[in-house]
Amino acid sequence: MSTQSDNVDWVATVGMRYGARSRRVVLTAAVVATSLTVSFTAGCTHRGRDDDRAPQHIPAPASPLTRPASPAHSTAGSPLAVKIDNAPAARPQTGLAAADVVYTEPVEGGLSRLLAVYATTLPTAVGPVRSARESDLELLRQFERPALAFSGAQHKLLPLIGRAPLRAESPGAAPAAYYRGLGKAAPHNLYLRPARLLSAAPGKRALTTGFGYGPAPSSGGTRTASRTVRYPAARFTFTWSAQRSRWLVAMDGTPTVTTDRVPVAPATVVVQYVRIRGSRYHDALGNHTPYTETVGSGSAEVLRDGRSFAASWSRPVATGGTTFTARDGRPLKFAAGQVWVVFAPAP
């Protein structure tokens, strides 16, 4: 029997834990908190312009990046990770359908951000690009020195980013890789030219996520027409399309398409139950930034081929990927194609 709607609702839990308030306060927090983000300069950190206070118009570069290619820029096997804005004012996004993996993360005010990972394809542009969070550093350690494209970060977080085993590529570090687009107001209009950071897509070998791909389990699973996961101020719905053999994404009730009108449709969706706690960082109103713990183990749901499979996840160390097993203890394979991982709080 098909399940028409199966919701994960943690509005009350996270709303109380992280200080989600009225819409007016949330919007005020989003504006005020921008004063806390800063950018990198090439090779070092400092207090500079952030994603909200950057120049209103950064033209798209007319020529390739002119700085010499460093070993970091020519290293094979390093994927590109882009922190993507997911506020309603930022939609539709650009380049999202081309990502190999999309992680959804809770941020202040009950909102969400996306972390998109690119390895097999580099789209012409990606964005809007927004600021990084502490959780991103732990999540990205599974990759071999990835390039992280982000608009800025809270100044107290910058030393951590500077010491992390990744290439921090903010507008201050790689100004020629970014531009301000038309049609959206700042800070929702900062875009990345991936080719200015990576000379070529590194390929599947760079996706050291721990995911296995292959046929679905021959038995088990529940027929599922749609699945909804709720954050305090964001909602993700994945609806199975037998015609496309994909899950069609909708955010806050609106179908998700890119700026070039391509539907975002992953082959596999994972609802991963993790510990979400307050971090050491907070916004201007005192609301702690959520920290999503992705090292450890727990339960999960894997959606593929129109069915939902109960699973367990395990990531013993930050430098390793995450494996998923079915109830019978066998590895739970993903369908070939884009993967969305939605982090939800463990019960």
Question: Which residue stretches match the model-derived regions?
Answer:
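Small/flexible residues
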Residues: D6, A12, G19, R23-V26, ...
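Low-complexity, compositionally biased segments
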Residues: D9-A12, R53-P55, Y103, P255, ...
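Generic N-terminal leader/targeting and pre-domain segments
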Residues: G15, A29-V32, G48, P61-A62, ...
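C-terminal region of N-terminal signal peptides and the immediate post-cleavage residues
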Residues: S39-A62
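Sec-dependent bacterial lipoprotein signal peptides
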Residues: M1-A42
